[in-house]
Amino acid sequence: VRAVKRRLIVDGEITEFLQNRSTAAELGVKNNGSARSVDFNREPIIRMSNTFVEPGDHTVEELIKEVRHGIYFKSFTEWNIDDKRLNQRYVGLEAYRIENGQLGTLVKAPVLEITTPALWGSVRARGKTVAFESATCGKGDPMQGIPVWTGGPDTLLGGVRIGSR
């Protein structure tokens, strides 16, 4: 099955789910080639491929200028999401306080804990520049780890609470 570009969320609404031949037939939708395996002798599993947030129209500086009081997560030391893909947690590695549109002092290990609907519902703007990093999509028993790319632009979230470790 030929892989195709998938737009899972558009304007905050889920528009598509990952499918293989079996699930697509069962649900009466088109197969979008989302099953892969680590080797010929393993069952193909529905899994993410290269996944990213599409760019927007803003520079990083423009995004920061929009913030009255907040935190800029420049990089992350950890992130995780539960098996239901509902609750997620992000811990900043390099992060800065933002006051009145200006970057300030470093912040030690800020934490964003949020649900998936709240995360996507809080997006206010996206940056122009997209950065990617390598990752692994791990699934199955026995475990199958497949290389993928993740990433996206700097993204402005509004109305979220940031804690600390």
Predicted regions and their residues:
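N-terminal small-residue-enriched
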Residues: V1-R165
